[in-house]
C-alpha cells in the first residue's frame, strides 16, 4: 500500500518480496527487495590446504548454494604440492579467485618465497590478502595498497569489511610474533611481526569505527596461552583458528 505521504508498505510473514513504486505520471520508478525474518551470513573457511586444490570446487559450490555467504582461506595454503611450489603460490591464489573467495589470510608458511614475491602473487586474488601484524622492511603492513588482478580493489593490508545482506562483517588476521622471529624466507627476507595484542586492539577499534555489525579475528599462526579469551574480551565476535583441522 501507498499512503498520502508516499510511504510504501508491504506485509509478509517471512522470506522476501519486491516492491516497485512508480510516480503518478509514470516518469520514474524504483524497485527494491525487502527481506523479512531472521537473516544469517554463513562464513565458510578453508585452511592448511598446502597447495591442494581438490577441495576448492566443493568450497565454490557450497558458497554458490548458500545465499549471502562469505568464503575465505585462513592461511597455510599456498605451498606444499609440486605444482604449487613451481609457481610460488600464484597457482593457489588464482584458484582461490576462480572459486570466488572473498579474502585470504596469510600464515607465516605462506611467505616461503619471500615477502616481495608473495605481494606480487597476491595480485592474482580477487579478494584482499591480509596479514595484520606482519610488516615489510618499511614498517607498513605487508599487503598495504596491494591490488587484485582486476585493479579495482585496493587493501590496507590490515583489515577488510565484507557487506552481506545489509550487514557489515569485519575481518583481521594475526600471526604469532614469536614464531615470526625464527622464520625467514629462503631469499633472505625476514618477517617482522608487531605485538599481537596491540595490533588486535587497533584493528578492532578501526572496524568498530567502520560500523561493523560483527568482527572476526582470523588466527593464521597461534601463540601459546589463552589467546582466544584475550581476543574475545577485546570485542571480537568470533575467532577462526587457521591452525585447527576443522577449518580445512
Task: Put a short name on every predicted segment.
Residues 1-38:
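Extracytoplasmic soluble-region selector
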Residues 18, 35-248:
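Acidic, metal/ion-coordinating pockets
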Amino acid at each position: 500500500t501507498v499512503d498520502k505521504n508516499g510511504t510504501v508498505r508491504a506485509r509478509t510473514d517471512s522470506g522476501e518480496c519486491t516492491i516497485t513504486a512508480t510516480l503518478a505520471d509514470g516518469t520514474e520508478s524504483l524497485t527494491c527487495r525487502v527481506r523479512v525474518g531472521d537473516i544469517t551470513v554463513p562464513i565458510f573457511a578453508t585452511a592448511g590446504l598446502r597447495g591442494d586444490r581438490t577441495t576448492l570446487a566443493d568450497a565454490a559450490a557450497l558458497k554458490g548454494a548458500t545465499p549471502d555467504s562469505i568464503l575465505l582461506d585462513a592461511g597455510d595454503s599456498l605451498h606444499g604440492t609440486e605444482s604449487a611450489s613451481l609457481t610460488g603460490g600464484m597457482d593457489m591464489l588464482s584458484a582461490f579467485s576462480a572459486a570466488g573467495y572473498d579474502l585470504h589470510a596469510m600464515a607465516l608458511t605462506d611467505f616461503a618465497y619471500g615477502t616481495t614475491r608473495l605481494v606480487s602473487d597476491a595480485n592474482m586474488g580477487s579478494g584482499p590478502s591480509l596479514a595484520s601484524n606482519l610488516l615489510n622492511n618499511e614498517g607498513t603492513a605487508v599487503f598495504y595498497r596491494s591490488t587484485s588482478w582486476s585493479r579495482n580493489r585496493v587493501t590496507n593490508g590490515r583489515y577488510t569489511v565484507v557487506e552481506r545482506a545489509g550487514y557489515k562483517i569485519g575481518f583481521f588476521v594475526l600471526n604469532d610474533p614469536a614464531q615470526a622471529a625464527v622464520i625467514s624466507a629462503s631469499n633472505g627476507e625476514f618477517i617482522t611481526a608487531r605485538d599481537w595484542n596491540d595490533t588486535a586492539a587497533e584493528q578492532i577499534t578501526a572496524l568498530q569505527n567502520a560500523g561493523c555489525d560483527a568482527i572476526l579475528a582470523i588466527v593464521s599462526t597461534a601463540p601459546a596461552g589463552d589467546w582466544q579469551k584475550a581476543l574475545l574480551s577485546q570485542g571480537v565476535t568470533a575467532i577462526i583458528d587457521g591452525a585447527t583441522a576443522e577449518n580445512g
